[in-house]
């Protein structure tokens, strides 16, 4: 739950807002989940899994960390992609520090270089090289660190392996240096500001990404139409519409005899029951909204709106 901002004065508490940014599949959501200690962002091997900014909250005594996990910076191919890219680049503004993730190998791509240019005009930033478990020669990692330091936009460069949870804890100390005295923006026991309905929608989309192939899952939007607790029981009724862009895609999402939809819904139900702490009656329907990713009205209707950082 988000707190009301009290009047200015002396506080024994402080907060640090952190934009977590990087190219697709560099490990932003995995790192956010690891640091938060809860699953606040869905994770798959497919690029552009994260579509909107996800907030993860960690409170350690008087210091509260607010991580803004952003969509991967990439060359957009539709209006949804442009909104995703803008969400990532806009997150540099109005945060206390940007944490930019990089792979340990390969040339920096065009989107990453645009991001570096934006950092020259923005606030402080640190670089984090993830996936160090893939590095065979330590000299290669040192070369990557030197390359990033030479860009002149990072206060420091850190190396981690999210997969092995190696050196990730050190990031808390690094980020704490940018904390600002003031109130905690969230309750101390909060770990995200995402409403339960949105968490449910994200879990269903995650399962579609995991179980379906190629481009089809990226053309899917999930909208929770009903979320209602049954009085006197531990059961929640959830009705969901899964939107796709083509009639042919609808058939693939449903699958032969409804097999694919049942598989997605069953896996999603298990996850939902775990984070909601109750039984879930999940009903899913598949509908077609042609080319919704290029329709401004539908993007707004499906919840893809620009979000303030605080």
Question: Residue spans of the language-model regions?
Answer:
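Canonical P-loop GTPase G-domain recognition
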Residues: 124-126, 133-196
């Amino acid at each position: 739950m988000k707190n009301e901002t009290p009047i200015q004065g002396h506080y024994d508490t402080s907060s640090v807002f952190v934009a977590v940014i990087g190219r697709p599949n560099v490990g932003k959501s995995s790192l956010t989940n690891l640091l938060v200690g809860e699953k606040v962002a869905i994770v798959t091997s497919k690029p552009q899994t994260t579509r909107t900014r996800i907030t993860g909250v960690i409170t350690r005594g008087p210091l509260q960390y607010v991580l803004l996990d952003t969509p991967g910076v990439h060359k957009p191919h539709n209006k949804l992609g442009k909104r995703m890219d803008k969400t990532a680049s806009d997150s540099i503004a109005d945060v206390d520090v940007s944490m930019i993730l990089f792979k340990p190998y390969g040339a920096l791509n065009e989107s990453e270089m645009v991001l570096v240019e934006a950092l020259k005009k923005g606030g402080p930033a640190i670089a984090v090289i993830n996936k160090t478990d893939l590095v065979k020669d330590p000299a290669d990692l040192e070369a990557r660190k030197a390359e990033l330091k030479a860009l002149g936009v990072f206060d420091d460069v850190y190396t981690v392996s999210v997969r092995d949870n190696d050196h990730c804890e050190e990031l808390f100390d690094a980020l704490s240096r940018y904390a600002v005295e003031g109130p905690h923006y969230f309750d101390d026991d909060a770990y995200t500001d995402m409403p339960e309905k949105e968490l449910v929608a994200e879990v269903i989309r995650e399962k579609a990404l995991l179980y379906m192939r190629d481009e089809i899952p990226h053309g899917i939007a999930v909208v929770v139409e009903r979320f209602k607790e049954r009085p006197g029981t531990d059961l929640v009724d959830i009705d969901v519409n899964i939107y796709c862009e083509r009639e042919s895609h609808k058939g693939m999402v449903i699958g032969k005899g409804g097999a694919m939809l049942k598989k997605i819904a069953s896996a999603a139900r298990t996850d939902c029951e775990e984070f909601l702490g109750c039984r879930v009656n999940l009903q899913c329907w598949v509908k077609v909204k042609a080319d919704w990713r290029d329709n401004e009205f539908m993007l707004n209707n499906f919840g893809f709106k620009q979000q303030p950082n605080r």
